[in-house]
């Protein structure tokens, strides 16, 4: 344990406490339940306005592909904080919904849920707003043919067959960095609606339309964008109160009780601050876990404390005959291996039995890529391999603790980080697959150095990941792979890759074991794929 690790851990604990306080201060009444809607069982979270605020209407929030109702927490609580009782749904195959996902089934269950809420008198379609993102936005728009409501807000809608009639009071958002098919869909909706109409009489006659282009935003960042939340709430208020001046409604949205007195804007900041706190605590946790299991195994084997110490401090030395090729050659090997992988996946997907929408494709690609990279660098792979049990157990304990801690925090405010039973089964199947990929990465990256060499190694690791993603982009546009979800998740995959590499390097530096570091990275990667991609 080092002084800087202790200092970071103290800072992390402060971040966690402060983040928790901010979230608690701004929390609204909420309850979770499962709604029986015909043949669908849909998990729902209901967010109520502050106790002193009488609901002006209702909002139904629909998430996008590979998301869940917790991803929509920021928008859901913001709508509730401004006087709309809000219902966020988990569509089939997403979040807590264990039913298999297909696009038609997602639309069927979303529509059935709205119909059930209307029939039960829970919501009134004359004061209800549909809010959707990506796939959820497309479903909300197409719902106009079955369940017309007061207004619809479509955030970066997915490509769709347009409904027979346009939804009433439709607001569409598109991001500056949206992928071309999504940007094109927004323009198609604008053309179908006949351009912008946002006068008070347009809202009164249920024909208002506007297209908002958000600069410096991506497909996923729109969900956490204050501009999107503010303009969405103002649009909903204009639909609910068309006779009230827009300036008055805007002032009401800006100075709403929830924002002014309950620090609603700190909600998201608190969630992010908590994640930063967990990152700061990690170095101390890694050192403590490695030292603990090293001591346990020394005691169990009745050995001198210095005997296994070398295995916990230094990577095995690779002699000149087994030396790795240069980084430029490794990048070429990576591109070739990834291209071979996407070509093979045109013929068949080896891990199709996992039944994870796009997740089985990604896992299969990583398996093929990892196997080819190990074959190309087999001498270094043999020289790097070790069977020290203490390091593997330490890696397993640290990785499981990490996904439980991070998953619990994410599950509270940001996304569904807890795995249900079907996802745990897929997680177990993914770990050995991801170990092949992770070990190939550790082999080609080599031992963790210090100073500038460590930074260069880190950038090189991210370059290898970027290569893989760019090959997936190539496969989507040129080979018609259909795996658009991997493109849409670029932000999440980038953030995960950075944090996973930092954690894996920290463990490898403390254990000196490439296989143990790969085991740690594999467990984190398996958790990501099992938790994010929809069940089919």
Tell me what each language-model feature is.
Residues 310, 314, 328-536:
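Alpha-helical transmembrane segments of integral membrane proteins
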Residues 27-262:
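Soluble extramembrane regions of membrane proteins in the secretory/endomembrane system
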Residues 246-304, 318-330:
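Cytosolic-side membrane-insertion boundary helix
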Residues 1-7, 325-332:
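N-terminal membrane topogenic signal
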């Amino acid at each position: 344990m080092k002084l800087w690790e202790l200092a970071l851990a103290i800072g992390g604990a402060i971040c966690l406490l402060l983040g928790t306080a901010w979230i608690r201060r701004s929390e609204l009444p909420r309850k979770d339940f499962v709604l029986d809607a015909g043949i669908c069982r849909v998990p729902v979270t209901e967010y109520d306005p502050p106790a002193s605020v009488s609901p002006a209407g209702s909002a139904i929030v629909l998430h996008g592909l590979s998301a869940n109702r917790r991803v929509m927490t920021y928008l859901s609580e913001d709508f509730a904080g401004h006087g709309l009782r809000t219902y966020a749904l988990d569509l089939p195959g997403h979040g807590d919904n264990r039913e298999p996902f297909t696009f038609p089934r997602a639309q069927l269950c979303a529509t059935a849920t709205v119909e059930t809420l209307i029939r039960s008198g829970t919501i009134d379609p004359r004061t209800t707003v549909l809010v959707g993102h990506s796939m959820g936005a497309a479903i909300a728009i197409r719902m106009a043919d079955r369940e017309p409501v007061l207004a619809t807000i479509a955030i970066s809608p997915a490509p769709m067959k347009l409904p027979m009639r346009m939804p009433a009071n439709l607001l569409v958002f598109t991001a500056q960095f949206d992928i071309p098919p999504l940007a094109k869909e927004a323009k198609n909706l604008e053309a179908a609606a006949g351009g912008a109409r946002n006068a008070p009489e347009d809202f009164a006659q249920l024909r208002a339309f506007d297209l908002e282009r958000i600069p410096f935003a991506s497909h996923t960042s729109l969900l956490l964008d204050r501009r999107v939340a503010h303009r969405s709430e103002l649009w909903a208020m204009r639909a609910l109160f068309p006779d009230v001046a827009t300036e008055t409604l805007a002032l009401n949205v800006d100075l709403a009780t929830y924002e002014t007195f309950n620090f609603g804007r700190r909600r998201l900041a608190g969630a992010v601050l908590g994640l930063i706190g967990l990152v700061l605590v990690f170095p101390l946790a890694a050192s403590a876990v490695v030292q603990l299991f090293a001591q346990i195994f020394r005691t169990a084997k009745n050995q001198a404390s210095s005997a296994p110490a070398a295995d916990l401090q230094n990577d095995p030395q690779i002699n000149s005959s087994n030396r790795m090729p240069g980084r430029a050659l490794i990048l070429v090997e990576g591109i070739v291996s990834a291209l071979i992988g996407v070509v093979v996946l045109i013929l068949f997907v080896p891990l199709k039995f996992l039944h994870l929408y796009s997740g089985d494709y990604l896992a299969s690609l990583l398996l093929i890529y990892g196997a080819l990279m190990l074959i190309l660098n087999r001498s270094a792979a043999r020289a790097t391999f070790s069977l020290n049990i203490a390091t593997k157990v330490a890696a397993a304990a640290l990785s499981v603790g990490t996904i439980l801690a991070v998953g619990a925090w994410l599950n509270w405010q940001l996304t569904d980080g807890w795995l249900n039973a079907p996802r745990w089964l897929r997680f177990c199947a993914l770990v050995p697959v991801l170990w092949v990929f992770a070990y190939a990465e550790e082999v080609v990256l080599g031992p963790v150095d210090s100073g500038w060499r460590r930074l260069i190694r880190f950038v090189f690791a991210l370059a290898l990941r970027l290569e893989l993603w760019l090959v997936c982009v190539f496969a989507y546009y040129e080979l018609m792979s259909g795996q658009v979800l991997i493109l849409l998740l670029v932000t999440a995959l980038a953030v995960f890759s950075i944090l996973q590499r930092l954690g894996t390097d920290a463990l490898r530096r403390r254990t000196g074991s490439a296989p143990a570091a790969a085991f740690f990275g594999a467990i984190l990667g398996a958790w990501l794929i099992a938790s994010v991609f929809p069940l089919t």
